[in-house]
Amino acid sequence: MKQFMDEDFLLSNDVARTLYYDYAKDQPIFDYHCHLPPKEIAENRQFKDLTEIWLAGDHYKWRAMRSAGVDENLITGNASNYEKYQAWAKTVPLCIGNPIYHWTHLELRRPFGITNTLFNPQSADKIWQECNELLQQPEFSARGIMRQMNVKFSGTTDDPIDSLEYHKAIAEDRDFDIEVAPSWRPDKAVKIELPQFNDYIKQLEQVSDTEINGFDSLKKALSKRLDHFDKRGCKSADQGMEIVRFAPVPDEKELDRILQLRRNEQPLTELQISQFSTALLVWLGAEYCKRNWVMQMHIGALRNNNTRMFKLLGADSGFDSIADRTFAEQLSRLLDAMDQNNQLPKTILYCLNPRDNEMIATMIGNFQTGGIAGKIQFGSGWWFNDQKDGMERQLQQLSQLGLLSQFVGMLTDSRSFLSYTRHEYFRRILCEMIGRWVVNGEAPNDMNLLGNMVKNICFDNAKAYFK
């Protein structure tokens, strides 16, 4: 019987262990998509206690606590940090079988060094004291943890109207050598159907010093902000796409009319919404291509399902799930519309519904281009797929239908500075899968070949892709 989460956790054979320890384990982290607050990095936040760094904003943990029957006051309410922590300690033993159980113990192991101890109500007080003492040390500040985890790059998620003042401060700080770059998230400008669209356009007018009275002036305003992001080192754009829409792009006169209808609070048809979003995304794709940015598309979330809790807590609070819309044809036509003028940027496609894995894995082959290895990527298992089975499915289907060797690897997609251990989780799963291939005679026992492939997937491919 194996020991729980020992040093060889998830590594069942000698090949997997060699690949992990000799090629994967010590690779730096290129975390190209996350939701860390740049303010906390710029100000090098020192967290007061374990609840602040571990539970605040972590909707994975919040969902588990709700499923365990924990009162909302002990999750997002006014209970003390210690009370919230104790509620989490009571919840964790109930999470066996959920990746949260593994993540919890990995997050205690690194960076806190707590091993051979199960997290539960009995161990909670000792762990609380030990971790809170460590959190007062410089090595456990926001920047200190990033250094401990060997992070080389962090791509945050930012709105076009953001000032990026904290990215500027980080870049100008000669005492901090980790690159922190903004990522452009234009959802509020693209999704003309959102209730807050008109208020957002007013904000965009202010920050861009541009009156938006038509589609061309909207592009001018966004172009100014694109330049601002580019100046601050942006390498990537990210689209959240609950619905993948496509419609043939009409002339600019019709786009002006659609925008004017919306500015006048008039209802739009589904066709008009699709025409507007298609036109803007195709234009944005060309702008990304011109700046050599990567375009990421996160497809298939069903958001804010619980109206009562949305009114109470707002978005990103743990009330989202997997949607089941089909979107293959719309996605194909959208990518093709960008590609027809050779203006499809490097692109990473993520799907939330694992049903869509094979579709995405084959879709990327339609738009690959000579001169850019792996130009179009099937992104790592996202959100609800960010677990052992989900990661294995994505890796297997990419390897079967594309080129695993060109994969840009893992990202945290997290709001927590303790989530970097997800890279370790991914690397162990990757090495175990390849190790099984070798043991079964499905891949050669060539450590130079396989080791370099693992090394590339863990770091080098992403570094080259986002250059």
Curated annotation (Swiss-Prot):
EC number: 5.3.1.12
InterPro entries referenced in this protein's UniProt entry, alphabetically: Metal_Hydrolase (IPR032466), Uronate_isomerase (IPR003766)
GO MF, one example: glucuronate isomerase activity
Catalyzed reactions per annotation: D-glucuronate = D-fructuronate; aldehydo-D-galacturonate = keto-D-tagaturonate
The protein, known as: Uronate isomerase
Any single Pfam family the record assigns to this protein: UxaC
Pathway linked to the protein: Carbohydrate metabolism; pentose and glucuronate interconversion
Native organism: Mannheimia succiniciproducens (strain KCTC 0769BP / MBEL55E)
GO biological process assignments: D-galacturonate catabolic process; D-glucuronate catabolic process
Domain of life from the UniProt record: Bacteria
HAMAP family referenced in this protein's UniProt entry, alphabetically: UxaC
SUPFAM superfamilies listed in its UniProt record: Metallo-dependent hydrolases
The family this protein is said to belong to: Belongs to the metallo-dependent hydrolases superfamily. Uronate isomerase family.
Keywords: Isomerase
